[in-house]
């Protein structure tokens, strides 16, 4: 369940940020900002659902999921194929996420 929350949070964060990107960089209508802000609020809410005793750990673990989701966004939403360094970087970040999520805690 935690992974699904992280994945949904990443989707909402990327979509929200992309709405601002589209408005400022792609000359889209300011109307893009309304759904962008809703997406960013949903992103923040979803991260509060993560089971963690400290917020920073939840955010740190989320970082690797966000990077992978961003690489997928490049490919599927923007139509650009990630290069090998994108993939290597995403895999490295995901390894860090796994360490944070699954390390034994006292």
Swiss-Prot record:
State the name under which the record lists this protein.
UPF0060 membrane protein Oant_2511
Name the HAMAP family for this protein.
UPF0060
Q: Which family does it belong to?
A: Belongs to the UPF0060 family.
Asked if the record carries the keyword Nucleus, the reply is no
Topology versus the membrane: Multi-pass membrane protein
A Pfam family (short name) is UPF0060
Entry GO CC: plasma membrane
Localization per record: Cell inner membrane
What keywords would UniProt list here? Cell inner membrane, Cell membrane, Membrane, Transmembrane, Transmembrane helix
Q: What is its main location?
A: membrane
| InterPro entries (UniProt xref) | UPF0060 (IPR003844)
Per the UniProt entry, what species is this protein from, by scientific name? Brucella anthropi (strain ATCC 49188 / DSM 6882 / CCUG 24695 / JCM 21032 / LMG 3331 / NBRC 15819 / NCTC 12168 / Alc 37) (Ochrobactrum anthropi)
Q: Where are the transmembrane segments?
A: 3-23, 30-50, 60-80, 84-104
């Amino acid at each position: 369940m935690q992974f699904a929350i992280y994945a949904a949070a990443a989707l909402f964060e990327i979509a929200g940020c992309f709405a601002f990107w589209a408005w400022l960089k792609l000359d889209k209508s300011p109307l893009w900002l309304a759904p962008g802000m809703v997406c960013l609020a949903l992103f923040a809410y979803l991260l509060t659902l993560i089971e963690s005793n400290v917020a920073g750990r939840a955010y740190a673990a989320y970082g690797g999921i966000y990077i992978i989701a961003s690489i997928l966004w490049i490919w599927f939403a923007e139509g650009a194929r990630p290069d090998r360094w994108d993939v290597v970087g995403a895999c490295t970040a995901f390894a860090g996420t796994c360490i944070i999520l699954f390390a034994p805690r006292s």
